[in-house]
């Protein structure tokens, strides 16, 4: 079956199959081939950026970095001196410095792991829900927030799972609603 040419039906817009659109006059075969290659790589990059494993990895790395940064910032404002917790009294400045840096590193790793775990679970669940529903709306974030909150509170029992799910769903719904709202200059 062939598509009728626009000249046969002058009041209808031209309809072209994807990849068969006309190019400007004077376009060489080499330029057409380069354009098709660029479009192919653009589609590949779009597929990679929409893949669940990449989203989960980005959330994990970002969570690790943010958690470590928050821990580093809280260490600078700590009320308790880490040297007072030392089991043996450190005499040299070098030993004291090494102890403080090791303590900060341990805290940064612990906090970063927690943030990474939350980010990876939420991102993975939300990506699976989005793939199942084939939609990108606020309900994906709310339902993913509920499931993530329940998963993270699973060791504390069913009541804590329900409470964690509701709290995480409300938080993620509020953030998603704020991110999807129109910017101030468009109102």
Curated annotation (Swiss-Prot):
> Where does this one sit in the cell?
Mitochondrion inner membrane
Q: Name one GO biological process term.
A: protein insertion into mitochondrial inner membrane
Q: Which UniProt keywords apply?
A: Disulfide bond, Membrane, Mitochondrion, Mitochondrion inner membrane, Protein transport, Translocation, Transmembrane, Transmembrane helix, Transport
Disulfide bond sites: 52-127
Q: How does it sit in the membrane?
A: Multi-pass membrane protein
GO CC terms in record? TIM22 mitochondrial import inner membrane insertion complex
According to the record, the segments passing through the membrane are: 58-78, 138-154, 159-179
Q: Which domain of life is it from?
A: Eukaryota
**Role according to the record:** Essential core component of the TIM22 complex, a complex that mediates the import and insertion of multi-pass transmembrane proteins into the mitochondrial inner membrane. In the TIM22 complex, it constitutes the voltage-activated and signal-gated channel. Forms a twin-pore translocase that uses the membrane potential as external driving force in 2 voltage-dependent steps.
Return the similarity comment. Belongs to the Tim17/Tim22/Tim23 family.
Subunit record text: Component of the TIM22 complex, whose core is composed of TIM22 and TIM54, associated with the 70 kDa heterohexamer composed of TIM9 and TIM10 (or TIM8 and TIM13).
* Record protein name field: Mitochondrial import inner membrane translocase subunit TIM22
The organism is Cryptococcus neoformans var. neoformans serotype D (strain JEC21 / ATCC MYA-565) (Filobasidiella neoformans)
